[in-house]
Structures are given as C-alpha cells and as structure tokens.
C-alpha cells in the first residue's frame, strides 16, 4: 500500500495513539481538537487499550477509538519477559492493520503501552511519526519512538529526547483559556465554597492519595482556626470516614470523591495541594495557581522532576510524601494560605513559566510532519 499525504482525493487521516491514564488521554484529546480546528475535514482516529480510561473519555469527546493489546515491558526477568517478543509482534500486527485501514497520513503518539507497537508499525509503513512526551523523564515508548521521528515535542524544557522541541502540555481550552480572577466567584459557588475565606483545595488525583488524606484530616482543626476552608477531593472510593464509619465532617471542610472539570478547582483555589503529575504541574503553571506538590513516592521519581522547574522558579512548594504531616501543614501551609502578597507573587511566577497554546503548537507540528 502507498501512503501519499498529497493525495487530494481523501481528507487528511490522523491516527493518535496513547492511553491508560488521564495523563495520556487528556493531551491526546487536546491535540485532536486543535487538529480538527485547523483541518475540519481531517479524519481522526484514536488508538488505546481495551481497559484504559480512553475507552470512556475518547468516545465522550466525539472521537472514534480503536484498541490493541496492552504490552507492558517487564523491568526485571520474569515469565512475562519470555512472552514479550510474541506479544509485541502480535500488537504490531494489530497496529499495522489499524494504520492501513485508516490510510493514515501521520501517527501522533503521546506515550503509554500502545505507542511502542504503533511506532514500530508506522516505521514499517513509512508513515511520519510525531511524538509528545509529557513527563520530564521520558517514558520507554517515546524513547523508542524518538529514534524514528524528526518531529518530537516535550512538555518540559529539560526533557532529554533527541531533537525535541519544547511546546508545553496540550490541555483543554476550558483550562488553557481560564482567567482565574474572572472565573473565581462562579467556581467557588459551584464547588460550595465561601467567596471570602482562604480556600485550600486538596487532591491526590483520580485514584486518591491516602497519605495526603490522613495528613489533611488531622490538620483540619488548625486549618479551621486559621479561617481556612478546605475542599478535599479524596478520589473515587477513598471517602474519608469518621470514627463511627460515617462521612467525616468538620468546620470549614467539605469532601467529594471527584470533580468534573478541574478549571473550577484552579479558579477557586488560593492554594492547590496535589501530586505532581505532568498534567497537573503544567496546568497549574499555565493558569498561575499557587501549589504545594507532594510527589508520588514510588516509580522512577518522575513526579519530583516534573515539579522541580516550577518550584525553582518560585511558583510552587514541594514536600516529600514522608515529610507531609499535620505539623508541616500547620507550620508551612497555613502561613502561606494567609499571606496574600506571597500568593500573588507565586501566581505571577507560575504563570510566567506556563504555556497555554501547546495544543496549537502540536497541531502545527503534525501538519509540518505531513507536508515534509
């Protein structure tokens, strides 16, 4: 089969690969939206796994989703390592079939389990590959894919990938276009927060963070005494209970398991306390939210690396998970929450580092790859 992007008899065909977590799916969808805005006639297909968040998020955004088998790469010798060649070969065949049926002009990968077989299949078919790496420390799939691509983009300036261009993190327009000052009153009303009291919003991500939950709940009396109101996004199935097994309640404290639309959170918060996933760090910087980051203490340390530039610039504070305690919250967080001058300075420094138009930059890179 011959792939000819100059063929005017068919619209541009773009295949975007990635998934497993919202950290992969959100930028993928932002890139898709920006491509559709620039090229409304484009045929856009997303590729993910059968069990990731993409199975819900991609169709909800109005895009078609194809799936291939999930092929994790074992990090140490195991039975899975022995099975890897056969599994990878099968996934590459699936990927090739998808690309051929889509008559793809370009493959865009954002990382995750599906990307390695998609990159390998696209290389065999001589389809241009465009890569976006979200984390400061590049994942394995994108390190492999970067060897086959002349169009590599990164969210963080310090990410080490061959030939990488710093474009920022593609994000939803509701976030990238957010004016916090204008949106704050409506956002606070929507989240059940008082319009005047300092607001701390706490989240551990979609799966929650037990260590954060414990520290915050133990510090609630001190937070309330300082006049601080707390919205606690606990994570699905992670509701905080009291000693009698009921939902914990306290003065100035409200908990929810999930918030649909982080733009309201960013607009309403005086301080956000959160993990340091690449998406969260990038969104916080783009819209200028003062933040306290508690990097996930497992994995390859990528969350601390994600947050480091923003912390160094003075736009955020970072505390190790092991050091997050009620005492730290009383001695460090409460003085921050009640210091309006410092919060304004953090917001200014944060926004100066952020990038709001990464989706447009990525769409331009995709179109550049097609025309190269």
Curated annotation (Swiss-Prot):
Top-level taxon: Bacteria
Keywords: Cell cycle, Cell division, Cell membrane, Cell shape, Cell wall biogenesis/degradation, Glycosyltransferase, Membrane, Peptidoglycan synthesis, Transferase
EC number: 2.4.1.227
GO molecular function term, any single one: undecaprenyldiphospho-muramoylpentapeptide beta-N-acetylglucosaminyltransferase activity
Residues reported to bind UDP-N-acetyl-alpha-D-glucosamine: 21-23, 135, 172, 206, 303
Matching NCBIfam families: murG
Protein name according to UniProt: UDP-N-acetylglucosamine--N-acetylmuramyl-(pentapeptide) pyrophosphoryl-undecaprenol N-acetylglucosamine transferase
Gene, per the UniProt record: murG
